């Protein structure tokens, strides 16, 4: 797709990144860290578009917006995740881009805030008739189980992906529940969400476009079992290579019954629109032994690394340059460019 004309001569695309992902150069530019997701996306963009400039997001904001107006990009490819390390403020960046009239990739502030609040997101999905784990919320100091059977899965009500998710998130008794709640409170992670634990297969489904194509579900595989083997996707499992090697963690295309695959293909676009997602996203599910599908959470800003799900398997399971091209196209088409 050809990039649209812009009223101000400038670059084709600005790659907007967190300032911590690179360093300033002597000539006033910005160099992203070699091998980073930002570097991978930048390389893919430059293979297709003639002028792509990385710009760091400065917490003071004015410097960043001045750079964007000076460059006059036809599209901002938004890879930012936080302001001053605070992920809960990512929606402020998209609001700023909208206020200044820039077309950008990815979900708007409305969708970012909705998916971050796991209670509201689950309520929106449950309203579609899609199964979600039962839950209760805990704000106080004492663990009061609202009659859900153990084990329970306890995580912050608000947060990203595997943030604060460790083996301790799975609790089997009241005393373990109390320790988990105390730990979350000590780290100031806000109210806790206590869910019934759904035993089953972890499925990850990528969606591309705004009439979203539902791509082949991927499945988490833990090749080595035994005491201490991971039962769900923790932060350690996702980001620690030694841990992944120890437990032979990998991902594969999920071999699913036709009926389950049909359920996924029907449910995912509904969830995508209900949660105000845009351009691309990832939805996480659990599938029980009797093939009951449960929605777990949505990731409005999934990792776009080339190897997110293993060697040469990006989050969508498609060829990497094609993934980046389709995200650009989706954003431009959505914005009427």
Identify what each model region corresponds to:
Residues 174-266, 289-294:
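Phosphate-binding site of ATP-dependent enzymes
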Residues 1-103, 110, 140-144, 334-336:
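ATP-binding N-terminal substructure of ATP-dependent carboxylate-amine bond-forming enzymes
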